[in-house]
Amino acid sequence: MASTSPATTNGDVAPANYDLVLKLAPHLDRHMIFPLLEFNAGRLKEDETDKAREILAAKYALLKKTNMTDYVANLYCELEGLKEPPAEYAERRQKVFHQLEKYEQETAKITELLQRDDVVNNLRSDKVANLEFLKKEHDVTIDMVNALYDFGQLQYSCGNYADASELLYRFRVLSTDNDKVSYATWGRLACEILTMNWESAMEELQKVRESIDTRLANNPLAQLQHRTELVHWALFPLFNYDKAREPLLDLFFNAGFINTIQANSPWILRYLTVAVITNRGRAKNAGVHQKQMKDVVRIVKQEAYEYQDPITRFVHALCIDFDFEEAQQQLVLAEEVLRSDFFLLAHADDFVDSARHLIFESYCKIHARISLKDLSARLGLNNDDAEKWIVNLIRDTRLDAKIDYKEGTVVMNHPPSSVYQQVIERTKGGFFRTQVLTAAVAR
């Protein structure tokens, strides 16, 4: 079971109990896991020395197989209390240096060619023809092309992500090896994420998605595994690049990907829920946002026995149980969890504000006159702050409501329709659909 608590109990509320690093890590590249560990280390208190050592050991275990030799040596010294690292680290450093020199020489010719306009202008979309041209005119071999890939991998392992990205790009332009091209695309996506080049990351992410949809169409298990990884990698641009929000929400709600989330990684529901709720007011299409919100509510309900946290419980309490008191309690806990999550910290205030809008909207649907005192409790604000918040809401959204200061109430100028009126409206809709179906059958 993915959650730490299957029910809405408030006894298990420490943010650490909802830390998802151990869930996320198996689906991330080791270089992507490192900033998550750094984030957790930065949140520790001075007296949490045991936890600090655990994270330090985790960093070392994570990176010791990479070629970031100097940094790994420093981690080892810190872990073992040494002033100087063992000689083996100097030997490894020298070995990596020689490998870099070797690949530099092996790729020098093809790199120089790809920087010449007269060569680039003769390249076409046909990779086979390009290789034939380069082989005939410039004595380029397949081994030279593959050396670009190997050099890119080495640079990535050294933590030189920008250089690795460029090498993998050059390789992809020339290679006809579909498997390696696919790996290179994943590699470039990782590089663009780690260098926070979000626009390029989104381009690579789209290429990876297309590869999954086409190359793995006849391998459902491989598709599931690759989609699971892509969803996890996509969290980086999703919460760091505003322009990624809508295309990535479209991706997550795609049938293949939402099924992947539900079947293989239900904890992603936390991030999907936050992304949708904080997208209110930003979404270009209000209808799409409303549908996504309905889908989130449906999935939260379906997955309640697989995954829960204060964020999903807030949605369950407000939109399924209509329990405003429980929703407010879960919102308080949700804010703590958001502030302890690497991806969500920067969105905590936005989520709380958007959640209060949801509470207010839901409350207004069933009340024509609302006590300010009662509403402030629902919103988790004191009376003065609640009053200011509502005034700003009325002003910014042109909500048809006013505050009756004498009575201490918010008066909605569009009271909810009666049950009788709702029945009439639904009957009209049903009658119209019946007419359409009848006409279709008649044709």
From Swiss-Prot:
It is found in: Cytoplasm. One of its GO terms (biological process) is translational initiation. The keyword Protein biosynthesis applies. Its main location: cytoplasm. SUPFAM superfamilies: Winged helix' DNA-binding domain. GO terms for molecular function: translation initiation factor activity. PROSITE patterns: PCI. Component of the eukaryotic translation initiation factor 3 (eIF-3) complex, which is involved in protein synthesis of a specialized repertoire of mRNAs and, together with other initiation factors, stimulates binding of mRNA and methionyl-tRNAi to the 40S ribosome. The eIF-3 complex specifically targets and initiates translation of a subset of mRNAs involved in cell proliferation. Component of the eukaryotic translation initiation factor 3 (eIF-3) complex. Belongs to the eIF-3 subunit E family. This is Eukaryotic translation initiation factor 3 subunit E. It comes from Neurospora crassa (strain ATCC 24698 / 74-OR23-1A / CBS 708.71 / DSM 1257 / FGSC 987). The gene is int-6.
